[in-house]
C-alpha cells in the first residue's frame, strides 16, 4: 500500500487539476505526460524483474479509470451477488450508465494511441454489458414461473446484508411459507411445457440460491439463541424441499449441468468433492432423465438464434455474419481435407483418411503413462520455440505448473485436456467402463496429445495466464476467447508452418484438431441457427473429424450446457486466423521479428485481436471507430 501511493507521488501533476479539466483531457493528458516522463527515466535501475524480464510499463491515460471501474464492479458484484435480485439489476444498470457518461466525457482526441484503444475497449465493454443486463432480465422472465418463491430467499439474505433487525418469529413464518410454496411449484412442474434449457437454468438458480439460503441461516443460528428455537424445524423442511426441487428440475431437463469448477485449469483438491455434492442430481452414473447421448440430454441451453449470435460477434469485433463464418470454416475444412489425404497416402491408406485417423488413435501410451507423455511433449515444444527464437519464455513460466487428472465425471463434458495454472489430463480411470477407458486412451493418443499439450501449456494457456497477470493487467475486463483460444490455436498453425509436425502421423494428429476447430464453427453456429440438432452435431464430428462417439458427445455436451458463451467454440479458428493474418502483415512484411511480434502479442493484454492490431500498426483511430478488419481475405 505504501509503495503504491509512493509511486503516484512521483508523477508530475498539473498545477490545476479539477474534474472538468480531467474529463476534457487536461488532467488526463498531463498525467499521461508525467507517466511518460517517469517511464523514460533510465537511471533508476527498476525496469526489470529478478529473472531479467521487463516489468510492465504499459501507459494509458485511461488505465486508472479502467482499474477503478474494475474494482468498483467487483465490489458491486460482491455486495449485490444474489442472482435474480431486483436490487442487483437496478444497481448494475445505474453503474453502467454512470460509467458510460464518464467515458464519453473524455477528450478522445487528446489521448495517446494506447489511450484511444482503451477508450474503445471500455466504451464497447460498457455498451455490451448494458445489453447483456437487459438480456439477463428477459431470461429471468422465462424461469420466474418455475421458482416464484425465489424473491423470498433473496429477501432474507439481502435484509441480512443491510443489517436489518431480525424478527425470529417472522423468519419462521417465512420459512414455513417457503416450504409450502416449493411443494406447490413441484406439483405445478408436472404440467409445465418449458424447454430443457429453461428447466436447467431454474435448477442451476436453485443451487446458487440454496448456498445463500444456508449462509443466512448459519449466520443467525450462530449469533441469536432465539433464532434456533423458532426456525430449526422450519429451515430443515424448507432446505430439504429446495434441494429436492432443484434435483427434480435438473432431472426433468435432462441437461448435463455445467461443472461447478473455476474455469480453465484452476483445479483445487476439493473440486471433485464439490462437483459430486453440489451439482443437482449428481451421481457417479446418470440413472434418471433422458438417456446420455439423446437430443434432450445433449441440447443443453438450446438454440439462441441469429440475433444473439450477431450481438456476441459484434462485441467480439468479428465483422462477419454467422453464415459467412460457416463459409470460412468450410474453406478451411477444404485445406484440411487436402492435407489429410496427403498424410493418409504417406501412411499407406490412400484416400481412406479415416483409416489413417484410426491408426493414429490406436497409438496410445499404456495406462498410467500419460503423465510422462505430457511432461515430455511440453519440454519438446519449449525447446522448439526457444531454438527458433519465436518468443521470450520467462524462466518462471516453465516452472510454475503441474499436472492434475480430469475426473471421470469431468470427462463427460471435456474428454481431452484443459490448461492454465495446471494442465488437467483426461486419462482412463478404473471406475470407468472398458469402453470409456479405451476411448479415453484413443482420444488422447500420442499424436493428438502432441498438439494439445503446447496449446494448454507453453506457449498456450499457461503462458497466457502468466503474461496477462504481469502485463497490462488492467485490460483483463476486456478478455475474449478470440484472444485466449485463438492465440493457442494460432500457435498450432504457426508451428505446422515451421515444421514442428514432421511425420505423417504427427500431421494427422495436428489436422484432426484443425478439422475439429472448423467443425466447431459449423456445428455450434448451425445448432444455434436451428440448422442442426445436437445429435446431428455429434454425428457431424464423427463423420468429418473422425472422433469416437463418446468424445463427440462430450464435445457437444460441453458446447451447449451453458458453461461457455454461444460463440466460444468459434473463437479457436477465427481468433487464430486473426493472429495469422496479423503475423503475415507485420512479420511477413519484415516490420517485426517473430520474437518482437509474439512478445508484444502477450504484453498488450487479453483484448480483441483487432485492437491488438491497432496497437501494433499505429493506425489512426477515431472516436466512432467500428470493427472493419476483414481478416479473411477470400471473403473480403
Tell what function each PLM region has.
Residues 10-30:
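N-terminal secretory signal peptides and thylakoid transit peptides that target proteins
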Residues 23, 28, 40-636:
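N-terminal maturation segment of proteins
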Amino acid at each position: 500500500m505504501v509503495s503504491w501511493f509512493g509511486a503516484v507521488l512521483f508523477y508530475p501533476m498539473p498545477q490545476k487539476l479539477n474534474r472538468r479539466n480531467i474529463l476534457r483531457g487536461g488532467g488526463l493528458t498531463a498525467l499521461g505526460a508525467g507517466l511518460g516522463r517517469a517511464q523514460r527515466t533510465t537511471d533508476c535501475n527498476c525496469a526489470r524483474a529478478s529473472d531479467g524480464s521487463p516489468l510492465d510499463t504499459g501507459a494509458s491515460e485511461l488505465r486508472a479509470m479502467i482499474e477503478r471501474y474494475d474494482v468498483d464492479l467487483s465490489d458491486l458484484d460482491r455486495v449485490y451477488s444474489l442472482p435474480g435480485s431486483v436490487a442487483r439489476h437496478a444497481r448494475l444498470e445505474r453503474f453502467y450508465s454512470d460509467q458510460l457518461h464518464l467515458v464519453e466525457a473524455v477528450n478522445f482526441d487528446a489521448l495517446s494511441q494506447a489511450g484511444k484503444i482503451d477508450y474503445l475497449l471500455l466504451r464497447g465493454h460498457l455498451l455490451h454489458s448494458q445489453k447483456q443486463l437487459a438480456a439477463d432480465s428477459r431470461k429471468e422472465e422465462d424461469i420466474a414461473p418455475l421458482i416464484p418463491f425465489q424473491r423470498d430467499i433473496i429477501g432474507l439474505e439481502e435484509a441480512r446484508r443491510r443489517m436489518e433487525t431480525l424478527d425470529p418469529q417472522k423468519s419462521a413464518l417465512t420459512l414455513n411459507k417457503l416450504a409450502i410454496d416449493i411443494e406447490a411449484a413441484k406439483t405445478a412442474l408436472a404440467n409445465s411445457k418449458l424447454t430443457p434449457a429453461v428447466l436447467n437454468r431454474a435448477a442451476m438458480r436453485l443451487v446458487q440460491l440454496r448456498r445463500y439460503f444456508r449462509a443466512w441461516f448459519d449466520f443467525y443460528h450462530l449469533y441469536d439463541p432465539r433464532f434456533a428455537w423458532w426456525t430449526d424445524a422450519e429451515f430443515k423442511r424448507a432446505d430439504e424441499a429446495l434441494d429436492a426441487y432443484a434435483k427434480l428440475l435438473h432431472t426433468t431437463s435432462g441437461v448435463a449441468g455445467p461443472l461447478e469448477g473455476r474455469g480453465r485449469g484452476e483445479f483445487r483438491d476439493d473440486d471433485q468433492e464439490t462437483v459430486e455434492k453440489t451439482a443437482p442430481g449428481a451421481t457417479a452414473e446418470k440413472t434418471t432423465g433422458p438417456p446420455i447421448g439423446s437430443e434432450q440430454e445433449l441440447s443443453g441451453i438450446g438454440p439462441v438464434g441469429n440475433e444473439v449470435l450477431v450481438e456476441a460477434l459484434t462485441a467480439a469485433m468479428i465483422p462477419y455474419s454467422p453464415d459467412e463464418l460457416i463459409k470460412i470454416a468450410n474453406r478451411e475444412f477444404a485445406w484440411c481435407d487436402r492435407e489429410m489425404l496427403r498424410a493418409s497416402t504417406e501412411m499407406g491408406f490412400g484416400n481412406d483418411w479415416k483409416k489413417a485417423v484410426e491408426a493414429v488413435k490406436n497409438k496410445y501410451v499404456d495406462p498410467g503413462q500419460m503423465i510422462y507423455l505430457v511432461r515430455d511433449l511440453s519440454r519438446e515444444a519449449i525447446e522448439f520455440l526457444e531454438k527458433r527464437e519465436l518468443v521470450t519464455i520467462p524462466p518462471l513460466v516453465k516452472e510454475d505448473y503441474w499436472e492434475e487428472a480430469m475426473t471421470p465425471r469431468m470427462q463427460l463434458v471435456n474428454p481431452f485436456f484443459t490448461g492454465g495454472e495446471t494442465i488437467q489430463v483426461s486419462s482412463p480411470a478404473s471406475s470407468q467402463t472398458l469402453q470409456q477407458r479405451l476411448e479415453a486412451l484413443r482420444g488422447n493418443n500420442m499424436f493428438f496429445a502432441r498438439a494439445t499439450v503446447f496449446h494448454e501449456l507453453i506457449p498456450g494457456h499457461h503462458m497466457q495466464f502468466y503474461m496477462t497477470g504481469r502485463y497490462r493487467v488492467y485490460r483483463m475486463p476486456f478478455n475474449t476467447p478470440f484472444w485466449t483460444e485463438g492465440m493457442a490455436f494460432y500457435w498450432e498453425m504457426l508451428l505446422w508452418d515451421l515444421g514442428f509436425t514432421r511425420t505423417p502421423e504427427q500431421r494427422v494428429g495436428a489436422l484432426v484438431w484443425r478439422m475439429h476447430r472448423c467443425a466447431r464453427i459449423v456445428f455450434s453456429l448451425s445448432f444455434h441457427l436451428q440448422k442442426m440438432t445436437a445429435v446431428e452435431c455429434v454425428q457431424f464430428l464423427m463423420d468429418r473429424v473422425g472422433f469416437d462417439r463418446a468424445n463427440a458427445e462430450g464435445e457437444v455436451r460441453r458446447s451447449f450446457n451453458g458453461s461457455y458463451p454461444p460463440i466460444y467454440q468459434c473463437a479457436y479458428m477465427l481468433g487464430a486466423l486473426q493472429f495469422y493474418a496479423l503475423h503475415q502483415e507485420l512479420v511477413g512484411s519484415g516490420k517485426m521479428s517473430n520474437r518482437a511480434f509474439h512478445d508484444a502479442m502477450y504484453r498488450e493484454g487479453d483484448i480483441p485481436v483487432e485492437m491488438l492490431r491497432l496497437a501494433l500498426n499505429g493506425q489512426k483511430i477515431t472516436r466512432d471507430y467500428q470493427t472493419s478488419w476483414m481478416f479473411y481475405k477470400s471473403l473480403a
